[in-house]
Amino acid sequence: MTAENFLWIFIGLVIFNFVFTTVLEYLNDKNWKNDIPNDLKDFYNAENYLKAKNYKIERGRISSISSSLSLIISLAMLYFYGFGFISDYAISLSDSIIIQSCIFFMILHLFTHILGIPFSYYSTFIIEEKYGFNKTTLKTFIADNIKGLIISSVIIIGLTSLAVFVIDFFSAGYWLSLIHI
């Protein structure tokens, strides 16, 4: 099997996942009942149930827009050699395969995080505010984003370093070492 075949399989799986998730989200939103299900009548009054339903549907729309943008950007990155450009850049900064891999994934992570901020902001300060769920201030929002970025970066760097070390250490037979983990 050629690299091009793997690329097309990967693209097909990404598109399938997007379509499958979008259809499921649509079907879930479409099948919300206006009347409270009997199992929930003890927990919700009609007004709160309708509020929860509308909130969920509105958040789903933002999620769909975000997912669509992610798909378009991912496909554009593949088509226009964006991932290769990032890889070449990472390679130019270090001779260490571990550092190169960490730089590559951190650039992708930063890019993804920055693209997600407007959607997160809208969800928090527009949608949650509309339904009375928002208790977040702009200062808290910014602090949470910075903390989340730092924590996720530490995790990404740690896992990437470990994975690349194992692959590099065991070379061609690295997958055999995974059986023993």
What are the functions of these language-model segments?
Residues 179-181:
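Conserved small/polar residues in nucleotide/adenosyl-binding loops
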